[in-house]
Amino acid sequence: MEAALKLARQYYLESGQPQRTRFISRHQSYHGITLGALAVGGHAARRAHFEPLLMPNVSRVSPCFAYRGKNAADETDEAYVRRLAQELDDEFQKVGPNTVCAFVAETVVGAVRLLPLSPSVRSTQMI
């Protein structure tokens, strides 16, 4: 993860866009235990002891977990994906789309028990 963060930053430096310093990730996400990975990770308890050392330019959106994340029993997978995509777009607009360096997403969730994304979530809307 550390290398990916640095690669994204370097890309924008080389492209003449040094203002792109923000990262967006998901609440409850796990990307590793290095300082960079903890910074973009969404697990608050894992970050707590290291918070003073972590970069502050990370914001988070809802986790992509339909089992717990759907608003109602009748919300379709497609509607759920649209809602999450809208939330992500809203976050880009909030922080300024020209300041975002990367959206850090998990394509497979769960460090212990793998939770693959449903086919409707693996759309270009979210990844």
Model-derived regions: residue spans:
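PLP-dependent aspartate aminotransferase-fold enzymes
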Residues: 1-101
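Active-site core of PLP-dependent enzymes with the aminotransferase class I/II
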Residues: 80-87, 91, 108-127
